[in-house]
Design a protein with these regions (language model features):
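Polytopic transmembrane helical bundles with strong interfacial aromatic enrichment
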Residues: 1-184
Length: 184
């Protein structure tokens, strides 16, 4: 996470704007957010289970590798912002959206692992017992809490995007494909 923080900080200093103006910077920020969520979840685990590290360690690496090796060079270069992006709403809207994507991705991954572990352990999925320290219970609680953070962040991100659109183009909603899919 320190290396990603350093890269994002250097791009911020060199470009004179928050590094979320293109796909490359957004993917690096997503990798940073995934690492942050990984570190937070590691602190929340009451046991010495290493499953969170096993699950989350490859994600930022894969996102960073995709951003670095798959995107064309012109998408990785810094460029001046267009006038519509020269707003403080850029930093708020895009960073909140990327944090929500990271939280929703993490929660979904935890839910998938919960289903896999519950199937292979062949234990009934019942949360009325006193087995609070079981792996399935821990995965369920972490996925629930992570998704519970992701959805409000997504809502806040969509609302801040609407306010930003009103400031930039004079309309909160324009039925743009990106906006329509955000609504869906």
């Amino acid at each position: 996470n320190c290396c990603l923080t350093g890269v994002l900080t250097c791009r911020w200093i060199n470009s004179q704007h928050f590094p979320l103006s293109n796909l490359y910077e957004s993917l690096l920020f997503l990798a940073w957010a995934l690492t942050l969520i990984h570190l937070i979840l590691e602190k929340l685990i009451p046991t010495n289970e290493n499953i969170i590290g096993i699950l989350f360690s490859p994600l930022p690496l894969l996102v960073s590798a995709f951003a670095t090796f798959s995107l064309p060079e012109q998408m990785q270069t810094m460029s001046p912002l267009i006038p519509a992006l020269k707003s403080n709403w850029l930093m708020m809207h895009v960073s909140i959206m990327m944090l929500s994507y990271a939280a929703l991705l993490a929660g979904s991954l935890l839910s998938i692992v919960f289903l896999i572990v519950a199937k292979f352990k062949k234990e009934p999925i019942s949360f009325e017992s006193n087995t609070v320290n079981s792996l399935t219970y821990m995965l369920d609680q972490l996925s629930y809490r992570t998704l519970g953070v992701g959805f409000p962040l997504l809502t806040l991100g969509i609302l801040s995007g609407a306010v930003w659109a009103n400031e930039a183009w004079g309309s909160y909603w324009s039925w743009d494909p990106k906006e329509t899919w955000a609504l869906i």
